[in-house]
């Protein structure tokens, strides 16, 4: 790991030591982790994510992982799965649909992990590898490990949260729609009761408020 600066990692390799190293870096995070996983979360990463931490870890998936219960098992793991909005009364004006240009990856094909991006020692791991066994052992891939560059970390974090919030909202809409039309109604309240969950210590919304306000 470079003290400050950029290092490179290349594949294919004869073993999974590189993935194990990424997993150790994730496990040593101090304030937050942000991960994109186009083809599911590797078992080595799942071993880290299944153990609770006192900070938030965000995972953005192309499709539902085979171990969704494990990923959601830790209360401070925030997981979003890519999707489009279901049909609704507004579809004549704002119906979402896929382009159909790619049959293997519909939504998310970026590969990066961000560790402690808003701290003094941010780490961005990004490149062409899928954080998978195949991409490590068989594919011709390259990754950059960028340490201590706050500007790069800010850019990657902004793009991650743009995508995460976009798809997390669509996941909530699908979940509401599955429970029936009455449960799907959610009107704005005419008081400040909505903010209570952002001030309940230890909850995801509480920690998210503090983290993005600079209290980390």
PLM feature spans:
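Beta-propeller domains
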Residues: 2-60, 66-68
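PLD/PLD-like phosphodiesterase catalytic module centered on the HKD motif
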Residues: 43-216
